[in-house]
């Protein structure tokens, strides 16, 4: 029997029933540091792996912040409203992350539906799989593969779904677990090794990438990846600093960027610049634009007639690509309908989760 043939053993009622849910773990406070200073990054940020204090978590959420090490999916209501997963359908979440969207999609697909979930992150993927399996979503309902979203077209025939899927979701943003883990090197807010790779087992780290990057290329990266207005000034400083020795940590990169900023820059301007530069370098290190272009080029062939696709982007470089792909596909007849405009989070969602502020969603329906 192939993976694409539902069996009588699959759930016959709404909700996950493949296996018994895991028991909830009791709350455990993190241990205090020994001595006066932490000895390594993992010890410095132990709270990221400790069991959360429910009272503290509630206070942070009420204030509009995302607790460290936890992820709050964005535009869930709008995404589910458009994709509208139905019992018995097949869908694909090509950027699984923490699985917040997948969890809701899976519920809508029951009984008899199936979801393919992809993610390239070798560190986050097993944690998310454990969480979703613990909720009762077994292998007959949820297929998880370690794969970049650009590989969707090649993955579908591998699992026997040769004709495509009823819907596709792509959330192009980082998960909070990636951002808040200092060992990953994604954020200027945490001091950690300057890595930034989605897949730590492949390619150059941000440290090594910066060491090899020339001025002209770095300027293009900062402009294309974040529309950075101070691209030339910042690129000149980073190239000069890297020539004296590698930039090993996020803290060192932050200081180098700050040294290129004008003295009269506001605190908000400083933070925005740091976020943009880190974002642009991350995009380049992971070749994210190239992966998105490949995904969009192959996307129509992955959708059944009438298939729906929703894509969440978080900066102009991504959104431009998605917008142009949907527009050109609509004009050529590939898509029968596209979103007339971007869909943004409500003010209420942004107040509850500040990381949602830059999110944009676009959708299309296959002809």
Indicate where each model-derived feature is located.
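S-adenosyl-L-methionine-dependent methyltransferase catalytic core, i.e., the SAM/SAH-binding region
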Residues: 1-367
């Amino acid at each position: 029997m192939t993976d694409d043939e539902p069996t009588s053993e699959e759930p016959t009622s709404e909700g996950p029933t493949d296996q018994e849910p895991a028991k909830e773990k009791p709350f455990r406070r993190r241990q205090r540091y020994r001595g006066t200073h932490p000895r390594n990054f993992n010890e410095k940020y132990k709270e990221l792996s400790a069991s959360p204090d429910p009272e503290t978590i509630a206070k942070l959420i009420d204030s509009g912040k995302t607790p460290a090490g936890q992820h709050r999916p964005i535009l869930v209501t709008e995404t589910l409203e458009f994709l509208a997963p139905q019992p018995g359908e097949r869908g694909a979440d090509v950027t699984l992350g923490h699985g917040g969207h997948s969890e809701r999609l899976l519920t809508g697909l029951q009984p008899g539906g199936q979801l393919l979930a992809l993610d390239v992150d070798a560190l986050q993927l097993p944690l998310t799989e454990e969480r979703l399996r613990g909720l009762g979503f077994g292998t007959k309902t949820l297929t998880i593969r370690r794969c970049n979203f650009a590989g969707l077209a090649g993955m579908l025939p591998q699992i026997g779904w040769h004709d495509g899927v009823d819907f596709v979701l792509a959330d192009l943003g980082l998960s909070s677990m990636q951002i808040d883990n200092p060992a990953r090197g994604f954020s200027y807010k945490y001091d950690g090794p300057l890595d930034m790779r989605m897949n730590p087992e492949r390619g150059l780290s941000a440290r090594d990438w910066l060491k090899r990057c020339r001025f002209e290329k770095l300027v293009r990266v900062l402009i294309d990846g974040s529309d950075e207005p101070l691209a030339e000034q910042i690129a000149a400083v980073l190239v000069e600093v890297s020539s004296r020795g590698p930039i090993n940590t996020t803290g060192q990169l932050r200081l180098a960027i700050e040294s290129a900023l004008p003295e009269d820059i506001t605190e908000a301007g400083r933070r925005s610049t740091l976020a943009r530069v880190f974002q642009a370098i991350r995009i380049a290190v992971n070749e994210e634009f190239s992966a998105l272009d490949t995904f969009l080029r192959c996307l129509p062939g992955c959708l059944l007639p009438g298939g729906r696709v929703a894509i969440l982007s978080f900066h102009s470089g991504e959104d431009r690509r998605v917008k142009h792909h949907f527009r050109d596909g609509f004009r050529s007849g590939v898509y029968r309908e596209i979103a007339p405009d971007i869909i943004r989070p409500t003010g209420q969602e942004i107040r509850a989760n500040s990381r949602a502020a830059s999110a944009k969603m676009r959708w299309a329906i296959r002809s």
